[in-house]
Amino acid sequence: MVSRVFVLVLMLALAGCGWHLRGSMPGMPSLDGLAVSVESVFGDGDLPSELRRQIARTGAVVVPPRAGVPAMRLLDEQVERRRVSGARGAAEQEFDLDYTVTWELIGADGQRLAGPVRLEQTRSLIIERDDLLGSEGREELLIEDLRRDIVFQLVERLQVLAGDALTEDE
């Protein structure tokens, strides 16, 4: 009985504080049926593919780039590793991984609606001299996590901008 009450109180507390799962943005404008394209000037790698997938999950129809369709244009993607601490010969070195994406949103009429905007995410990484393979794997996982965070932000901004455009048209 006590555990049921605890679970109920916990659920109410989480609902009341505004907490929600990543990817579930309550109150965000719907993209249902909106045709949008994703263009990348640096090729069709992991970021554009993940962005298309997540935009499609919002209900939008992701189409190839063409005139008359709004486009989220990815202008630049960079991953930089900066040493924070630890000498070159030390057993452990700490780095910051910086993941940066520059983007813009082009309206169906070809006019720029937003951007260019630069988004940046940073995570810390410790590389151990005795575990280089494990450290490399951790670095790849961190980069994937950073990419997911950036994609989440891009989709959220697209939803806000699409909502603004829809309310201006009404």
Segments from the language model and where they lie:
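Sec-dependent bacterial lipoprotein signal peptides
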Residues: M1-C17
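A structural "domain/chain start" motif
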Residues: A13-T58, G163-E170
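Short secondary-structure boundary/capping segments
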Residues: P26-M28, P64, Q111, V117
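Sec/Tat-exported extracytoplasmic proteins
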Residues: I55-G59, L105-D109, Q153-A165
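Short acidic low-complexity segments
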Residues: A60-A71
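Surface-exposed short loop/turn segments
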Residues: R73-R118, S124-E140
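C-terminal/domain-edge helix-coil "capping" segments
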Residues: L133-E170
